[in-house]
Amino acid sequence: MTAVSLGMPAVPPPPLASRRASRQIMVGPVPVGGGAPVSVQSMTTTLTADVNATLQQIAELTAAGCQIVRVAVPSQDDVEALPAIARKSQLPVIADIHFQPRYVFAAIEAGCAAVRVNPGNIRQFDDKVKEIAKAAGDAGVPIRIGVNAGSLDKRLLAKHGKATAEALVESALWECSLFEEHGFRDIKISVKHNDPVVMVRAYRQLAEACDYPLHLGVTEAGPAFQGTVKSAVAFGALLAEGIGDTIRVSLSAPPVEEIKVGTAILESLGLRERGLEIVSCPSCGRAQVDVYKLAEEVTAGLEGLPVPLRVAVMGCVVNGPGEAREADLGVASGNGKGQIFVKGKVIKTVPEGQIVETLIEEALRLADEMGAELPDELRSLVGGATVTVH
């Protein structure tokens, strides 16, 4: 029988545009730019001087899939903690420096993988560029020129009237030119704004004006929901155009949540191999099962499953069979029962009360066949063990 295409997206979908050509820098062992995969990073929320707490949070970020971590360095106590953190961290550490240029040199000496400088608030920054360029160049440490709308140089604010896209780009390119005068080009740039529209305009201009790798970010994006929406809109627009080499989602939430959102954005654009993906319908008057409950229970039951698996949880016979058939695993529900699909074929029909248990068992079986290293709590369920649904 001839296969019929249902017009479903490829898994993963192809990128929407070719990546922008850029220089490549190395942040520790992580390549940024030059065609390297887009990396996901975050920033610790601990007091950096509290070495144990900071390293614990870095360990949590590592487990969540973070690739680069940034730590704030506002005080001498934080500076003194940097050597231990840089040495023991599982991730390359970027020191985030404001106000004090001497902290830049201390961070380089401490073994940090990179240093972020804010040209808008470091005292006499332009006068220190020659020394910073030499120290960073000798140590092989890249510099991120991190321009932020909230701390833009007063001269540029006076010139442009406010923190426009043009003002952000002008600040970044000016500082780049100072480093270039001293032969230093191991640079990446960010031009962050809390308005996604201004941010997108700024990065588009920057992408046209230089070939440095770009760190994407919406600054002060807000609480989890609002920040997720802003970041997804801005990052999606730019990454779909091939712009962006590393991303940091800024949320007023635990840093691990930033990694989850950032990774999901990349997966959605085909820039990262998909992990577990739950496809579920929004429900409507046609639904004859509680789709919300089913989707939540399947998601909870498969949390931590380390495989690129698409699971469809559908509530009626209109779109349900098509979605379920195109997924790796799925259910089309109706009349108090569910048809279970695996790789496009119906393998069984089960009562509504067994849908979640069956989907979880089949997902774990597929993961096991793929050679996945399952967490102990999931591996114990492979082979038909009872699944407890809460």
Curated annotation (Swiss-Prot):
Gene3D superfamilies, per database record: Dihydropteroate synthase-like (3.20.20.20), Sulfite Reductase Hemoprotein, domain 1 (3.30.413.10)
Family the UniProt entry places it in: Belongs to the IspG family.
Gene field: ispG
Native source species: Salinispora arenicola (strain CNS-205)
Cofactors, names only: [4Fe-4S] cluster
Pathway: Isoprenoid biosynthesis; isopentenyl diphosphate biosynthesis via DXP pathway; isopentenyl diphosphate from 1-deoxy-D-xylulose 5-phosphate: step 5/6
Entry function: Converts 2C-methyl-D-erythritol 2,4-cyclodiphosphate (ME-2,4cPP) into 1-hydroxy-2-methyl-2-(E)-butenyl 4-diphosphate.
Keywords: 4Fe-4S, Iron, Iron-sulfur, Isoprene biosynthesis, Metal-binding, Oxidoreductase
Cofactor note: Binds 1 [4Fe-4S] cluster.
Residues where [4Fe-4S] cluster binds: C281, C284, C316, E323
Catalyzed chemical reaction(s): (2E)-4-hydroxy-3-methylbut-2-enyl diphosphate + oxidized [flavodoxin] + H2O + 2 H(+) = 2-C-methyl-D-erythritol 2,4-cyclic diphosphate + reduced [flavodoxin]
InterPro entries: Dihydropteroate_synth-like_sf, IspG_bac, IspG_bac-typ, NO2/SO3_Rdtase_4Fe4S_sf
An annotated GO BP: isopentenyl diphosphate biosynthetic process, methylerythritol 4-phosphate pathway
Molecular function terms from GO: 4 iron, 4 sulfur cluster binding; 4-hydroxy-3-methylbut-2-en-1-yl diphosphate synthase activity (ferredoxin); 4-hydroxy-3-methylbut-2-enyl-diphosphate synthase activity (flavodoxin); iron ion binding
NCBIfam families per the UniProt record, alphabetical: ispG_gcpE, PRK00366.1
E.C. code: 1.17.7.3
Superkingdom classification of source: Bacteria
Main enzyme class: oxidoreductase
One of the Pfam families matching this protein, by short name: GcpE
Protein name per its UniProtKB record: 4-hydroxy-3-methylbut-2-en-1-yl diphosphate synthase (flavodoxin)
